[in-house]
Structure formats: structure tokens, C-alpha cells
A protein has these predicted regions:
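Acetyl-CoA-dependent GNAT
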Residues: 7, 16-92, 99-105, 109, ...
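Terminal substrate-recognition subdomain of acyl/acetyltransferases
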Residues: 1-8, 146-165
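Residue-level recognition of the GNAT/N-acetyltransferase active site
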Residues: 86, 90, 119-121, 146
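Conserved SAM-binding loop
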Residues: 14, 91, 117-118, 136
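Short glycine/proline-centered loop/turn elements that form peptide/ligand docking sites
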Residues: 99, 121-125, 142-147
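Conserved GNAT acetyl-CoA-binding A-motif
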Residues: 106-117, 140
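Conserved catalytic-core motifs of GNAT/GCN5-like acyltransferases
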Residues: 117, 130, 135-153
């Protein structure tokens, strides 16, 4: 996947993930995490987990999936379980757009809070989450099995955005 092309992120389209998206999602996943989810994990989330919703972010030129997210909605809480952007498209606002979409989705599902875990060493993700209103509310000791790194638990409330008057 080449960076850029004619389409910027203004042409970004976010939609529900389908099974046929998994190979492209796996490319993003494998390039993003030291211990990636498996294709069967994504299939399970899509087909068998009633709490899961999965989304992909696509660009038209060159056509392809450049980001994705997996969330669970349980009662009035949405948990972001997995969110990644293809390395060639990072630092271009893609994660911010996807996160804004997810916050709107949470509102539409009647959620009051959104939570996630993030590695303390992932400074870029921490800045993104803090910039979009998340705050650290806890720590899970030795959460990540590959490095035994702790996870920071972050949360934020969700409410309708104010529109201009």
C-alpha cells in the first residue's frame, strides 16, 4: 500500500467490517502490534460475539483498508478492544476520525462511557486518547502477555456534541 495517492483522509469512509475485509485488516494488525490478533479472532468477533461491532476505514485511491476498530457494547459502556492504523497512514488524522466515529457510535448505542486499555509505552496512542477526552482511571498490572507491561485503563464519558448556534 503506498502512502497518499490522490485521496487524502477527507475521502475516508468508515463502515462495518465484513468477513471479506479480514485479509486487509490482518495486514494492518500485523504491522501494528507485537502480538497481533489472529484472523480467527476477527472471525469470532464478527460472527459469534453478540457484543462486538467491528469497523474499517477505507480510502478510494489507492483503494484499501487503512484502519480498523473492534468494540464491545455492554449495557451503557463501550470498550475499545482493538484500534489500529496502517503505518503508512499514521499521523494524518485517521485515528482521530475513527475515534470520533466510535464515540458517535457509542452515543447511538446509548452508552454513557467508553473505556480502553493502552500500553504506557505507546506515547502516540496516549496523546490521541488524552486529546480526545480520555483520562487514566486505572492500571492493570502485567496485562500484556508478550512483555508483561502494565496496561493503563482509560475512560471518558460520552454525550451529544454541541452544535453551533
Amino acid at each position: 500500500m503506498r502512502r497518499g495517492g490522490r485521496a487524502g483522509i477527507g475521502a475516508l469512509a468508515i463502515s462495518g467490517m465484513v468477513l471479506e475485509d479480514i485479509p486487509a485488516v490482518m495486514e494492518v494488525e500485523n504491522r501494528s502490534f507485537p502480538t497481533p490478533w489472529s484472523a480467527s479472532s476477527f472471525r469470532h468477533e464478527l460472527l459469534e460475539n453478540p457484543y462486538a461491532s467491528l469497523f474499517v476505514a477505507r480510502i478510494p485511491d489507492p483503494p484499501g483498508i487503512i484502519a480498523f476498530a473492534c468494540v464491545w457494547v455492554v449495557d451503557e459502556e463501550m470498550k475499545i478492544n482493538n484500534l489500529a492504523v496502517h503505518p503508512l497512514w499514521r499521523s494524518r488524522g485517521v485515528a482521530t476520525r475513527l475515534l470520533e466515529f466510535l464515540l458517535d457510535f457509542a452515543l447511538g448505542q446509548g452508552c454513557r462511557e467508553v473505556t480502553l486499555e493502552v500500553r504506557p509505552s505507546n506515547a502516540v496512542a496516549l496523546r490521541l486518547y488524552q486529546r480526545t477526552g480520555f483520562a487514566v482511571v486505572g492500571r492493570r498490572k502485567r496485562y500484556y502477555t508478550d512483555t508483561h507491561e502494565d496496561a493503563l485503563v482509560m475512560a471518558r464519558s460520552v454525550h451529544p456534541r454541541k452544535t453551533g448556534s
